[in-house]
């Protein structure tokens, strides 16, 4: 796959609507041509301990952040006509659909691919297929795991190798 948008969400709590950050990496002709990152005010607007432990974000980080529709208005032109790629499609696609429903936005039925599923087929010998393991195997060192843009970059790197 040579043209796509890799996307990653982090959530504030266990609600899929609680996206608190997003990273997007645009790949055209196999090259990264653009990136986007934003904090997002989550809905519902509370952080649970475990989610904050994973990504390091807290309510203070996002209290002045834009809400999802404002952020998506910036992302939409970047991804127009591109399939979306995520390392755990089940999570990221469900977040995207949930937050669209939450804000009563029409969901455009994006075409989604999963690098995690693809990596299980491409690299069955790996001890696991977590993002950092697969990206390292593909030659990308994921230094800031669970930062949405860093995770989207790692996903893009993997997708260029195996999709």
Residue ranges of predicted features:
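Generic alpha-helical structural context detector
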Residues: 117-120, 136, 157-160
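Short, glycine/acidic-enriched loop or turn micro-motifs at the edges of active sites
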Residues: 11-13, 117, 154
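Acidic, divalent-metal-coordinating active-site segment for phosphoryl/phosphodiester hydrolysis
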Residues: 147-160
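Catalytic-loop motifs flanking and including active-site residues across diverse enzymes
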Residues: 92, 111, 151-154
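Conserved beta-strand -> loop -> alpha-helix junction used to position metal-binding or nucleic-acid-contacting
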Residues: 106-119
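Conserved non-catalytic scaffold segment of RNase H-like nuclease domains
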Residues: 1-109, 124-128, 132-146
């Amino acid at each position: 796959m040579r043209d796509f948008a890799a996307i990653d969400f982090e959530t504030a709590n266990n609600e899929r609507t609680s996206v608190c950050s997003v990273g997007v990496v645009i790949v055209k002709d196999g090259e990264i041509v653009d990136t986007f990152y934003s904090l997002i005010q989550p809905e519902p607007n509370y952080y649970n301990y475990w989610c904050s432990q994973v990504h390091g974000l807290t309510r203070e980080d996002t209290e002045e952040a834009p809400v999802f529709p404002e952020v998506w208005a910036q992302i939409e032109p970047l991804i127009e006509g591109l399939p979306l790629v995520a390392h755990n499609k089940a999570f990221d696609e469900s977040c995207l659909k949930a937050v669209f429903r939450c804000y009563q936005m029409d969901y455009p039925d994006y075409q989604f691919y999963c690098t995690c599923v693809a990596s299980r087929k491409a690299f069955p010998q790996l001890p696991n297929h977590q993002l950092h393991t697969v990206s390292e195997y593909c030659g990308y060192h994921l230094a800031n795991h669970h930062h949405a843009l860093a995770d989207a970059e790692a996903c893009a790197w993997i997708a260029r190798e195996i999709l």
